[in-house]
Amino acid sequence: MLRERLNDDMRTALKAREAGKSRLSVLRLALAAVKNREIDLRRELTDDEVVDVLAREVRSRQDVLPDYERGGRADLVEKMREEIRWLQEYLPRQATPEEIEAAVRAQIEASGAQGMRDIGKVMGPVMQAMRGKADGRLVQETAKRLLGG
């Protein structure tokens, strides 16, 4: 479903003659990333897996933003932010830090996690429940903070 939506949107962008526009290039890059993952796995991806690929693309762009900002490359910062906005249209609504903290607290309570040694009991179920809706690093930071790490 999501892969077809990406293809349809790319066709629409092509027909609208958006050849030089960033949206078309972002859609092409996203579809290439999805296709590469399908080649690696030798099968078609599920929607959840496509979301994972797109989230990875967003994360990679977010990771380079601080470098571009430190380098004074306002043009590249704006380009990356625009690409992130385009990609986020295809991702589920992201959980707020408060929602993440509530989920982590609930899992700590449910699992009886006591400290950092029990972080696995918390991270696995929370990440499964928030798949595609929360950045793993933010969930991990929250879990560490709440577990006293």
Predicted segments with their positions:
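Residues that recognize and position ribonucleotide moieties
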Residues: 120
